[in-house]
Amino acid sequence: MLSRVSIRSLPLCTRTFATTSILKQSELTAATDSSGKEIVSGAPRELVTERVVRIYQEAKPATQSGHHNGSHWKLDWDVLGKGNRWENDLMGYQGSADYMQGTIMKFDTKESAIKFAENQGWDHYVQEPKKRHFRKKDYSANFYHSAGPLKHIRTK
């Protein structure tokens, strides 16, 4: 909790804020994990530190010829087990206790995504994008001679 403390009665610009001594030293050390990193999100420790994340680059959409979102690397979380999913009886919707399930983070480079995951203390694995193979097709290939029997194509 912050309280306003006036040091001297000088002009208004010299007033400062000071924190009260509500937080004890034991509470400050309880907020850090074993590696010395501070957990500030307020989430349970097992959900914050023991997560596995996937780092990948999104594939090109099959219905378009452009490379939309192909330059970004994404980070998302694996699905938790332990009964953290359920189905709504009335509508049949899927529910989850995992608050990070629908969260996807974008990064400019793979290295920055890996560094972020390591700084958060998450285990990670990287899915490298599959290389696209471009095969040149000619219209004349439809009329090449084949040694086998002729194809009979039925239209009706």
Curated annotation (Swiss-Prot):
Subcellular location: Mitochondrion inner membrane
Domain of life: Eukaryota
Residue span of the annotated presequence: 1-17
BP-aspect Gene Ontology terms: electron transport chain
Subunit structure: Component of the mitochondrial membrane respiratory chain NADH dehydrogenase (Complex I).
Function of the protein: Accessory subunit of the mitochondrial membrane respiratory chain NADH dehydrogenase (Complex I), that is believed not to be involved in catalysis. Complex I functions in the transfer of electrons from NADH to the respiratory chain. The immediate electron acceptor for the enzyme is believed to be ubiquinone. Involved in osmotic stress resistance and thermotolerance.
Protein name as catalogued: NADH dehydrogenase [ubiquinone] iron-sulfur protein 4, mitochondrial
Pfam families: NDUS4
Membrane topology: Peripheral membrane protein
Species: Candida albicans (strain SC5314 / ATCC MYA-2876)
Membership in a protein family: Belongs to the complex I NDUFS4 subunit family.
InterPro entries found in the cross-reference section: NADH_UbQ_FeS_4_mit-like, NDUFS4-like_sf
Principal location class: mitochondrion
Gene Ontology CC: one annotated term: respiratory chain complex I
Alphabetized UniProt keyword annotations: Electron transport, Membrane, Mitochondrion, Mitochondrion inner membrane, Respiratory chain, Transit peptide, Transport, Virulence
Phenotype on disruption: Leads to thermosensitivity, as well as to osmotic stress agents sorbitol and KCl.
